[in-house]
Each structure stands twice: as C-alpha cells, then as structure tokens.
Amino acid sequence: MILKGENFKMVNKKSNMYQCWINHKGIKKSFYKEYLNNILVLNKSEIITSAVNELKNTFYQIEDVKAIQNIYEDEREIKGDKFIKLYIRENDKLINEGYEIKYLKTEDNKECISICAKNDNGVLYGVFALLRLLEQNYEFKDKEIIDNPKKNIRIVNHWDNIDGTVERGFAGSSILFESCRNKDIMKAVMDAIGGIAATNEALRKAFNDDYKVADDLERINDYARMLSSVGINGVIINNTNVHRSETYLMDDKIDIVKIISEIMGRWGVKTYLSINFAAPITLGDLQTADPLDNEVRTWWKKRAEHVYSIVPNLGGFMVKADSEGRPGPFTYGRNHADGANMLANAIAPYGGILIWRCFVYNCRQDWRDHTIDRAKAAYECFEPLDGHFLDNVYLQIKNGPMDFQVREPIAPLFGTMDKTNKLMELQITQEYTGQQKHVCFLVPWWKEVLSAQTYANATASQVSERINGIAAIVNVGSDENWTGHFLAQANLYGYGRLSWNSDLTSEQIIEEWINLTFGDDPIIIKNVQAILMNSWETYEKYTSPLGIGWMVAPGHHYGPDVDGYEFSPWGTYHRADCNGIGIGRTLESGTGYAGQYNEPLKSLYNNLETCPDELLLFFHHVSYNHVLKSGKTVIQHIYDTHFEGCEAVKEFISKWEELEGKVDKDIYVQTLERLRIQFDSARDWRDQINTYFYRMSGIEDEKGRKIY
C-alpha cells in the first residue's frame, strides 16, 4: 500500500505558508525603510553575520532589484544620511541577551537607529525586534527601547525520533532526522498514524535501516532563524523517550548532533540532547547504571568529555527517568537527586546544564483503588529533595499536575522548592487540544498559568516569578506551513514572545502575529483575532467539562471516548456514575491532593463551596444536580457548553469565509478545510458527551435540544 500525504509535496520555500511571520513584506510601508540602505557593523561573529544577513535579505526583498545596500565597518565612510548601527558594549540598562534600540543624530547631522547589546545574541534579537517594529510602522524618532528577557532559558523540546517520526507530532515528519533508505516510508507512517507514541524498536528492526541528519539543511537553518526571531535560545533536538537507536546520538551518531548544533548556533540557539539514563548498559560498556556506582560516574564523565570535544557548544542534557517505562535511579534504590547530580557533575566542566523532567508517576495504577492519585506523584517525588540538587540542575515541571489537559490547576511544585532551579514545561504541539486539526490558540491559557499566585512567599508568589526559564514541546514538522494547521503558527510565535516577556498580553501577541503574517487589513485582523482569542474557550466547551480532563480516545488522543481511559492503569479517570461525576481530591474524604497547595489555595480547592467552577470536577465528586456559581446545574452546564462550543466553530468558519480573496489562496483553502474538520469533530464531541451523560443521569436538557 502506498500512503500519500502533505509530506510528499514539494515544499515551496518562498510561499507565505513557509515564510511564516518573518516574511518582512510589511516593511515596504514603513517610513523608516530607507535606513536599511546603510548598515554600520562594529563587531564580528557568526551570530552578528546572521543579524546582518537578516537586514540584507530584508532590504533586497522589499527594494527594487537595482537598489544596493551598503555595509560599513567605519562610521566615517557612510555616504547616506540615514543608517542602522549594530554594536556590542557594556550598558547598565541591559542584562543577559537584552538590547537597546535608539534613534539618534550624529555630530554630522546624520540620522541613525542604533541597536546596542551586551552580546551578539542581543544584537540579533534587536535586529528582529527592529524589523518587527518597522512592519508595524513604529515611530522611532526620539525613542529609546530597552528590552531584556524575563528568563535566561527559553527552549523548545522536540519529540523527534532518529528515524524521522515525531511522537505527538501533527505537522509531518521530522525536519531534523530521517532514515537513510526508507525516508518516504517513514514519512508515510507519520501521515498514516500521526503522532502516536514513539516508534517502537520492532518497526525499526523490520526496516533494517540506518539514520542520519535530514538532507534539507537549509530548512534546519530556516527553523533556527524562526526560533531566534521570537527570542528562543535553546532546542532539545530528540525525543525525551530515548530508545536504543537515539542513544547512539552520544556515540557513533554524534556527528548528527554536531551538524545541527553548528546550524542552530549561527542564530544564537543552543542545542541540547535528550539522553538515555541507562546508556552505560545500552551501549554495552557496563552492567549497571547505578548513579552512585563509581564506574558509572566515571563512564559518564568520559562520555561527557567525548560529546563536548565534538559538540563544544552543546547546552546540556535532558533526562526523563523512572516514568512510563523509562529507566532511572529508582531501579537502584536511589532518588532523583542522586541521578541528576551524577549527570550534572559530568557536564559541569563544560558549562552544561542538566534538565530533569518531573513527569514521574505510576502508570500501572489499579483503577479500583481510589486512594492512589497520579496528580500527587511529582510533588511527593521531588518536594522532599529541595536543596539536594546541584546548581546546574533544572527541574522541568509541567504546567499542571496531570498531562496538558485543556483545564488543570497549576502544579503544586511551583509553590515550593525555593532552593531548586525550576523550568515550566508547556506543550505547543496540540496533543490534547485538537492535534492541529482544530484551531486552539494556547497563549491565553499559558498567561493564566504564568500569572497564577502560588502564595509561596511575599517577594515571589506568582508562578512566572518562581521559575528560572520556560520549555515547551514544539509543534513543528515537515509540512510546508511548519505546523500542520496554519493558524497553529500563532502558538509557536506566542510561546516565543511569552517566554521572552510574560507581561505581554494575549491581545498584544496575537495582534503582532496577525500583522506580521497577514498584513494590516482591518477585516483580516478583526476576524482572525476573533477566531484565535475565542478558540481555547471554545475547545474546552465542546470537550471535557469543568476540569475533569481526558475523555479522549486512548493511544492517539484525538476525538471523544468518554470511558476510553476509565478502566486503564494510567490514572486518568472521571468516576462518573448514575448519580454524579468527578474526582475526590479533598483532605477529608478524597486523595488529599488539595493539601499540596499553600494557603489559601489549599482551602479554596478543598472546599466545595469555594472551589472555582472550572476546576470543580478535578477536585470534587458531585451530583449532576449540584448548582454551580453560574446558577446552572452540572448536567445543564455540560449540555449548554457542548452545544455552544459546536456553534462557536460554525462562527469560526463563517468568519474565515469572509476572508476569501483577502488572504493567500493556499492558506485560505487549507485553513478552511481544517475548520470544517474541526466542526465535524466538535459535533462528535457534543453528541457523544451529551448522550453519555443523558443516558448516565437520565436528566433531560432543559432546552429540549436533540440528544441521542
């Protein structure tokens, strides 16, 4: 059988789909575009060269083919009366990778827009910021812009496998790796099965293939440029579930890492490697991976020396241990600090950091046992270890206690562990939010999480204040538009901007993205903004209600299956019966999970009367006739929201159809197709959820609508 899909089309790298938000076409309308004629560059580096090339390519894209851009190293040689100046120097107003953009006049009355930074990364970010502002026709005269990143670590995680498949990938195959002989077959596998859990070793053995860096190195360079344009400074290139084949990325496949690292480095993006905790065994050198065993510790030190001798700019390692079948320190009776510190010690001499995921829980739970609670696992595992981790260890904590459900409370770990470095983990790829078949703009959700109060202490209570950086599983693949659904590009753009400055509003971010992507047509801005800003709430309305989560088809996680996980070992239950629904997580009669929060959150969630409606079923098992703060019963809320959500998708389609002829034809057609797929799926969700709970409760819809 021959499988065909979007991956097999030739990618047009000049298309609007491919160019994303960095096509720079809007600069043609800027009053300041003539400054691009002359560029003064006072420092040299590979990253500065990328910054200059960005200005150069922009100039030749927007100007007449006969125009010439001049690059200078000496200000005295500048012939024009307007220029852009790039330079590095100490500046008390700047920190880390921040930049200053300033309008000034020289002694000989020339006009200049200067970009100053403390390092070359800052200059590059300043150039992208300048171009972004030019596209929005910003008035620079007598202005000074100081922009420092809120966090030093701003990374994306790839769940790419070395054979070219992508776990939870919904935009085609990997842009980083591919099979040597069966590339098209592996792309077909991605088309056929999408982002189901990682490719298993049996499939790889059946193909008997070898693996390499993707042939299209130009696309990897374009991707690095895309990341840099929104301030992302790190990329973990391979799946956190490291299998046997990927283990060799730190052995005889290390040249793959070197090639990717060199390309990423041109754009100020550090490369990180997910590693196999059991690598000493997998690579056949030792019989144990015990982190306190001297031979194991020596093995890792030598391995780190080898890796950094070939990839000197590697940012560090990422580890998923003791979770979902992955090996870890628990195997040897050790704790996670033992495991993390052993690896952190090995890479410390090279400036490497060790990112250790906190996604640790018992995935072999007995559904009959109501005392076991997956939500409690990360806190119970890591909180007692506060202060035990080395300074170059960073714990990567999911935004919520479960697994990127459309509504969860913040993870309790953000309100504790003051002596430990913490990263927040978000998910850009839409595993549980429509898999890039549905439009679901995630920035408003992330804003809620980052601004949430933990009540940990008076000086740093907000989640954004209590983390050292942000990470996110990225949504990129080999599709021409990068993200499967064109509008899903807004999530990658939004993540980058939010990781740089979490004070930006969702409205600011989406207005920027629309302007950079589509231009300044007011109808486009109005309609696309209306679709995106309402999409997360809409998705929540027609899927799982009131924070209960899940109810998705097992395995691939797309579409409704109310009882799909109800009797599974994964700890993902809704506990619905003929009387009510919800998980009891109170201190008095539930699992006690609510007790992991600081006051007043502990009491807020623990008390049925004060628990927010949107999280009610996450914390409490209630009857279908329980009255919400809205005045509706739980069952009527379920009926109403599912009808409302489905109707909202109809409105999305109508608003998009108004843009025919105004947006790029290919973008219009592909997006309309996805919106229609979304409506069909939303209707399935509506009818299956409403029918399930009508049959379970026997309570009719007050409005008499059709329920099956």
Q: Where is each model-derived feature located?
A:
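Short, well-ordered secondary-structure micro-motifs within conserved domains or adaptor modules
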Residues: 66-97, 113-114
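Catalytic domains of carbohydrate-active enzymes that cleave complex glycans
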Residues: 458-708
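Feature activates predominantly on carbohydrate-active enzymes
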Residues: 5-8, 16-26, 30-31, 36, ...
